[in-house]
Amino acid sequence: MTLPTRREARDEKRRSAKPTDRARRRRLLWIGIPSLVILLLLAWLGFRVLTVKTSLEAAQASLQDAQAGGDVSSAIESVSREAGTAASAAGDPVWRAAEVIPWAGDNLRGVRVAAEALDVVANRIGKPVIDMQRDGQGSILSRALPVIADGGEALAPLTAELAALETNDALIGPVKGGVVQVSQVLSGLQPVLDLLPGLLGADGAKNYLLVFQNNAESLPLGGSAASQTMIRADNGSLAIVGQASSTTFDGIGDVGVEISDALRTLYGVTYGTRINMSVTRPDWPSAAQMVAAFWNKRVDKTHVDGAISIDPLALSRILLATGPITVPGPEGDIELNNENAVEILLTKTYEWWDAYTPEGGVGSDAFFAATAAKVFEAVSSGAFDLKDMAWAVSESIDRGSIMAWMEDPEEQAFIESSGKLAGILPTDNSVETALGVYFRDVSASKIDYYLRTSIDASMTCADGLTRVTASATMNLDITQEAAEALPAYVQSYRNGSTYYSKHVFFYAPPGMEIESMRMEGDWVKPFREGNMDLGRVVAPFESRMPPGSTVTVEVTFVGDGEFGPLSIRSTPMVKPTEVEVSDTCH
């Protein structure tokens, strides 16, 4: 008998194997291969998740560094790089496929959408605009306009998707926190991107009146509306198309703005007939429209699409970002910088020119106009430090030195949602209980460069009632001798350096009434009592202040209902008002 070879024995064993064994191995093979693929895909997905996490954390760190005072350009470069990496990783086909997995898919989608949104902000908007700002090739707005418009369109669906994800209960804590954080940023940024092209004249030229207030003659919203500049925005290009000063409007009288008898009683019969007094009422929209009416009656019929207020205090902060500017002075060029701008604009100019004379008025008007033009040129060209400019603008808005009004309802609604930029008092107490305390010079002087002010306010709750007590103190910090040496234009038009007439207006929180008053000083009293404005009880005081004198007025308001935390709105003064607030109700 011939024995089978090894190969023949192996073949025979294979032929005699049970079908169930072969099927088992086949099943194991079919199970093992997909399992291996899934494990590899999960490993790849885990790697991509780690990449996204690392990149987003790095981007966040760069932003925090910039907010803490770091270099903005470097931060933008870092955010751009990390956001691009995160968006690329989250856009991986494996990632997108995994988004259909129940529960986990929602979290992956949340991370992806957040990463893609940051990528659009950083790489389709932020970095290109920053590069334009740094390239020194002139005005950036016309070049940046299409970038902003395209970026806004790309960002809009991501903004909407993130807003919807905020309420998704499937998101785990870290993912939801990141989604909410990015969504909140986009909810503020998206309206800007949507509105900015139109504001810059992408859909037709827009005309904006720039109003310069003089804080040396304080009025509730800032100071005498001494100078105006008309700026035209046309497809991103900005140009000065007209300028005027307060003397332009001398003797103009009524300009057709409807003013109630109550307002004339509260602010005086000349309110609405003199442009410098247009900022008397602490409501920038009404003041802006009044200034526009003056312009249209005396200068030209240019349609005013909006008005922006700025004062020397804001200007000094802006000069920190742009660097010094040079303006022709009485005996050669004058350098204005962030340290000397307020002093020069609010005191030195009155030493150089006597504005009561025709020649002096022309000289000072030309100086202010040249200053406005130089600052406009520096800002519109993009020749400034981005971090310092962001601080200058935000600080000035917070202190009331920059305000804006737009005729377009959608644009105005956005401004009003932006807080103090609108220059209006809240209409209720749901978010804050805002008390208005405003100062007003009525001596036709520029003495308030030397005026020091303070406000002390408190909120208490007892027996179902809420009380707000506020005191305002004014100190005219100049000696009689020094006051007598001041230029005539700085002294009181009526009383020289003998005394200066001042008003203080307390605007009660909505729903509160006057409970009591108190006054300290040689000549101070309440006047024009029983008035309401802007839905609030108003408590006005008048005083006469010789050099070196101090006056304090105090009012307690009382009311029942719900009141938010106490806050103060006040006049931006040359010497910043010292404010103390205590609130034992919250």
Question: What does each model-identified segment do?
Answer:
Residues T2-R10, K18, W30-S35, W44-E580, ...:
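Non-catalytic, solvent-exposed segments at the cell envelope interface
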Residues R14-R26:
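Short, Lys/Arg-rich N-terminal segment immediately upstream of the first membrane anchor
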Residues L41:
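Often metal-dependent polyanion-binding catalytic scaffolds in large enzymes
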